[in-house]
Every structure is written in C-alpha cells, then in structure tokens.
Regions:
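Conserved catalytic core of the tyrosine transesterase superfamily
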Residues: 1-150
Length: 150
C-alpha cells in the first residue's frame, strides 16, 4: 500500500466512521501530506506499512525547527491517529508514533483587570436600587477573591 492509498482510506474512515467535517479531514490530511512531502524530499521511500519510529522522530525534529510547539503537538496527534487507524485495520502491527511525546505547552495566564478598570466598573454600577447593590457585591467578591467568570 502506498501513502496516497493509505491517506484516502483514512479520509474515508474519518468521514464515514468518525463523522468528521470536511474541514477536520482536510487538517488531518494536511499533516500527513507534510510527512509524505518530507519523506519524498529526504529520498525516503518507506511505505506507511514499513516506516519506522526513527524516521518519524527525524521528521518531528525537522518540523520542530520550523513551527510552534502547539502545531507540533497537533501534527504528532494527527500522525498517531493515522497510524492507529492502520493498526486497527491490521495493515500494521504497531504504531511508530506511539511512544513519541508531544512537546510540553505552557499554559497562558489569564488576562486580568487593572485596579483602575475595576474602579471604573464599580463606579458604573447604579446603586439606586437593590439590584445595583447586588451587582456591586458580586463584582467585589469576584475581584477580592481573584475569581473569574468562565
């Protein structure tokens, strides 16, 4: 089986069995085609049924120089799914991406309001009725306790 046949079967699986949207299928396919292109440019002829983990690691090392860790994680995840499909359909015995870890992605701290912004927010509350008093209490609690609305 060559790469394009395997990719077509995988696309059919994603569409029919998993019910994914065309856009999702296109994104998964793009990541697999990125690997195929790299293999071709590197003169590596291995079929998807024979490719070894070391080759996948070389590819990931190559893309790590070009793209953000979040994109690397997405590509690794997509390749894991592709090779899991090949294992599930018994085209391969093992998944060469199984023990390859995605890069660690730090979590971004949430945006916070400045003291001035909080003062403006509290000043904008209409305190002439009980609902205004309630709203002020809610804002004071959220701000004072460091809570956030999600």
């Amino acid at each position: 089986m060559n790469w394009l046949d395997a990719l077509k079967y995988y696309q059919d699986y994603l569409r029919i069995e998993r019910g994914l949207s065309d856009n999702s299928i296109k994104n998964y396919s793009f990541d697999i085609k990125k690997l195929i292109k790299w293999l071709k440019n590197s003169s590596i002829i291995d079929s998807p049924l024979e490719i070894k983990r070391e080759i996948i690691q070389e590819f990931i090392y190559h893309i790590a120089k070009e793209i953000h860790p979040r994109s690397q994680s997405r590509i690794i995840s997509g390749l894991k799914g592709f090779f899991n499909y090949l294992v599930f359909e018994e085209y391969r015995a093992t998944n060469p991406v199984d023990h390859i870890e995605s890069p660690k992605i730090g979590r971004k701290l949430p945006d916070t309001l400045s003291v001035k912004e909080i003062d403006h927010l509290i000043a904008a509350i209409d305190l002439s009725n009980s609902q205004g008093e309630r709203n002020r209490a809610i804002i004071e609690i959220l701000y004072g306790c460091g809570l956030r609305v999600s």
